[in-house]
Amino acid sequence: MRASKIIQEAALLSGRGDIADYIEATDRTNFSKETSKACNQMVTLLNMMISELCTSFIPMIATEKIYATDKIEYDKLSKNAVEILKIYDAFGKEVDFKVDYEHVKISSPCAKVVYKFHPKTYALTDNIDYEEKDISGSVLAYGLAAEFALTEGDFDRACSFHDRYVEGVHAISKPKNSTVK
């Protein structure tokens, strides 16, 4: 899922077709500084929103092949790990581990690590680490439109978008076996 597509959708929801056009344009010299600034603000808001979302509601999870015999250094992982969930050996059997400050101690050689991570700061053209199966781009666009409306001082619109965003996040993050009473 590309950051630019989420921002475009949020811009259109917010009545800011100029930002959507700015993102699509190959030559941006004809756009105002205000449009460029608003687009950059949306990129910043998207990063803040994703950071909150991955730490509070829908974690980003990576599965990575890595070979280690006694410990895994955090800097050897491709993403910024915040919690190690599982470690497997070459045969798919879970490996016992202990988390330390600088590394993870493992009880036997491992081949795969599953962990929660905090994403990098995304640029407009980056793909974000969420996939549509994790959360839809439309839900993210509603959240971004809500945040942007707050910065514009449009509290009624912000509440409307926020309600849609929260409804989408709760529908996704609700346990699969939960029942409604």
What does each of the following model-derived ranges do?
Residues 1-181:
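Glycine-enriched, solvent-exposed interface loops adjoining structured elements
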